[in-house]
């Protein structure tokens, strides 16, 4: 059986009296895209730094690929894009990518070949001989992305990779991440952008205040939350809406009625009572002649799951500024 790409068991990191990472455990199979999500200060970046041996855990165990521990040997199998970008501003773009390739063990000719290929892949070919400082922030970020991938690592670790990218370049990055997955390699990243995570992740781990809140395959998590019975409703007119009121007020059918989410174009959402199913509620409405234009079991977005598990206040903060 193939060993996982990464395993964390009870990992703890303290800074003085502050516990930044508190007993976090998760396991990442090979060949998937895995996202670490959480509010600001949750411990995302600290976790990635421990995996990369930039800082050491105070307790717990980290195992990389075939039983490797964080350190020099494991580093040869890892490509890392840190949150704090760092390139040599006065070097030519192609030279800096070649340089990082050679640092990771490539022969000069191979490093030069791969650097050129990555520049073309990322739409930077015409900038190859420009100095890094001549590039925009987003373009520099793509250059650093290339430096993390030039040796074709088995495990790619990206800290806030979409920060600062416009929609076009964000799409390019998503495409590259998908190519890495299709090649059988593994991608681990942190992000505060739930919409990006939902587009690329196979599995996620949500952490808050240093503790793991939940983890698992994204599809399974969404299915589990959908099973809690949230239904979006829209009615043909005010008369139908009024006719539905006593049915939606029946505690045997509906546990909670709430306003529809913004831009959802529903009249309301209802959370079903414990022993109720969507067909049972639909039958009750139709049986009373309620004219319905929409009856939809809500499959939650990743953002909605995040809000449910972490809280609206933290989720709003996460949308407003990059997380760590």
Language-model features and meaning:
Residues 3-6, 13-209, 214:
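ABC transporter nucleotide-binding domains
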Residues 11, 256-257, 295:
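Generic beta-strand hydrophobic packing signal
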Residues 30, 66, 126, 235-237, ...:
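Non-catalytic surface loops within mature trypsin-like serine protease
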Residues 102-105, 226, 230, 310-315:
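Non-catalytic alpha-helical coupling and interface elements of nucleotide-dependent molecular machines
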Residues 174-272:
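ABC transporter nucleotide-binding domain
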Residues 273-324:
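C-terminal coupling/interaction segments
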């Amino acid at each position: 059986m193939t060993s996982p790409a990464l395993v964390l068991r009870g990992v703890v990191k303290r800074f003085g009296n502050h516990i930044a990472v508190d007993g976090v455990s998760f396991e990442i199979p090979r060949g998937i895209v895995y996202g670490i999500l959480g509010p600001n200060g949750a411990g995302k970046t600290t976790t990635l730094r421990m995996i990369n041996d930039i800082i050491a855990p105070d307790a717990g165990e980290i195992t990389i690929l075939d039983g490797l521990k964080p350190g020099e040997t494991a580093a040869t199998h890892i490509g890392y894009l840190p949150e704090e970008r760092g390139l040599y501003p006065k070097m030519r773009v192609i030279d800096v990518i070649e340089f990082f390739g050679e640092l990771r063990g490539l022969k000069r000719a191979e490093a030069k070949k791969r650097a050129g290929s990555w520049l073309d892949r990322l739409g930077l070919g015409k900038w190859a001989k420009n100095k890094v400082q001549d590039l925009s922030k987003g373009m520099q970020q793509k250059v650093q992305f290339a430096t993390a991938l030039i040796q074709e690592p088995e495990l790619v670790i990206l800290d806030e990779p979409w920060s600062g990218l416009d929609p076009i370049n964000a799409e390019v990055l998503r495409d590259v991440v998908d190519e890495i997955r299709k090649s059988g390699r593994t991608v681990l990243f942190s992000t505060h952008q739930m919409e990006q995570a939902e587009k690329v992740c196979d599995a996620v781990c949500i952490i808050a205040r240093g503790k793991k809140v939940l983890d698992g395959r994204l599809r399974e998590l969404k299915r589990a939350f959908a099973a809690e019975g949230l239904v979006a409703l829209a009615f043909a007119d005010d008369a139908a809406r009024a006719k539905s009121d006593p049915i939606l007020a029946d505690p045997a059918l509906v546990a909670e009625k709430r306003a529809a989410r913004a831009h959802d174009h529903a009249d309301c959402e209802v959370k079903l009572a414990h022993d109720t199913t969507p067909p049972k509620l639909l039958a009750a409405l139709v049986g009373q002649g309620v004219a319905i234009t929409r009856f939809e079991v809500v499959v939650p977005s990743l953002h909605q799951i995040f809000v449910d598990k972490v809280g609206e206040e933290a989720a709003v903060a996460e949308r407003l500024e990059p997380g760590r």
